[in-house]
Amino acid sequence: MAVMPPPNSVNGSERRYLEDGIWQHGRFYGSWKPGKYLFPIDSEELNRLDIFHKVFLLARDNKPFQAPIQRKAPRMMDIGTGTGIWPINVAEECFTDAQIMAVDLNQILPALIPPGVLPKQYDIEEPTWDSLYTDCDFIHMRMLLGSIQTDLWPQVYRNIFEHLAPGIGHLEHIEVDWTPRCDDDERPANSAFEKWAELFFDGMDRFNRIARVVPQETRQLLEATGFTDVKQEMIRAYVCPWSSDRQEREIARWFNIGLSHSLESLSLKPLVEKLGWKPEDVRKLCTTAKRETCVLRFHTYCNIYVWTARKPGPPQ
């Protein structure tokens, strides 16, 4: 039986998806197929997902996607849609006649959405996607590492391939590499952020849900699936706005906010349930890491990876 937070702690829209949730480690998690999705679905997490939508827009010239779309009324899918901010953005500003299926294990979209956006509760780890759109012009997915069983990634890519339109169907996949990096000596000694990342990756490995970005393996997997025109883009995101470059500073401001929200959300379950940490100790580590990532003299950054690919074949 789900334990609800105090009545005055949630508003009406939140209560719509929290009523069937599970209260664990001080956060709210989805209860449909429990254990499949290891991250919260509470208001703080929804804010985090929307913040990263802004990060990705800033990092990509304010474009929600870059693939060429040939049909005027395209059919699209957003896999792991979260709050639905991406399909809503596309439907309102790019293709008002598009049909966009917003697919997720948890239905946490807002009540008011554009008419072309179709919410779909679905487990993308299923062997086949029989009830999802086919003949798609575009399939979008982002920040799904850690959400998919490690050995099921080839199957997920095969299903995406099968649901794209031959010749004109494109995939775009975006991930954040949470590995802290620094190209100079301006890095903290005994970094709490580095410790957090190592523990997070370890815990997720023990769940058999890899969270590490391995760029070459992803590219090879896309090519092995049958995709052509496979391209990989890497975008640097500093964890605080120290850079003299205006765009880098703006990306860093938003990435810092998103990272601050991510530390606890991502690491609570893996550290508590697989590494034996207490929730309060996880929060202490996250607080220390947050403080570290706000120090301007530290030049730490993370990489954002974007893979794009096309399904070959004559258009039908």
UniProtKB/Swiss-Prot annotation:
It is an enzyme of class 2 (transferase). Induction: Constitutively expressed under both trichothecenes mycotoxin production and sexual development conditions. Disruption phenotype: Strongly reduces expression of the transcription factors TRI6 and ZEB2 that control the biosynthesis of the mycotoxins trichothecenes and zearalenon, respectively. Exhibits an earlier induction of sexual fruiting body (perithecia) formation and drastically reduces disease symptoms in wheat. GO terms for biological process: methylation; sporulation resulting in formation of a cellular spore. This is Secondary metabolism regulator laeA. GO terms for cellular component: cytoplasm; nucleus. InterPro entries: SAM-dependent_MTases_sf. The keyword Plastid does not apply. It comes from Gibberella zeae (strain ATCC MYA-4620 / CBS 123657 / FGSC 9075 / NRRL 31084 / PH-1). Methyltransferase that performs automethylation. No other methyl-accepting substrate has been identified yet. Component of the velvet transcription factor complex that acts as a global regulator for secondary metabolite gene expression. Controls the expression of the mycotoxins trichothecenes and zearalenon gene clusters. Negatively controls perithecial induction, but positively controls virulence toward the host plant. It is found in: Nucleus; Cytoplasm. CDD domains: AdoMet_MTases (cd02440). Belongs to the methyltransferase superfamily. LaeA methyltransferase family. Its main location: nucleus. Its EC number is 2.1.1.-. GO terms for molecular function: methyltransferase activity. It catalyses: L-methionyl-[protein] + S-adenosyl-L-methionine = S-methyl-L-methionyl-[protein] + S-adenosyl-L-homocysteine. Pfam families: Methyltransf_23 (PF13489). The keyword Zinc does not apply. Keywords: Cytoplasm, Methyltransferase, Nucleus, S-adenosyl-L-methionine, Sporulation, Transcription, Transcription regulation, Transferase, Virulence. Component of the heterotrimeric velvet complex composed of laeA, ve1 and velB; Ve1 acting as a bridging protein between laeA and velB. Interacts directly with veA.
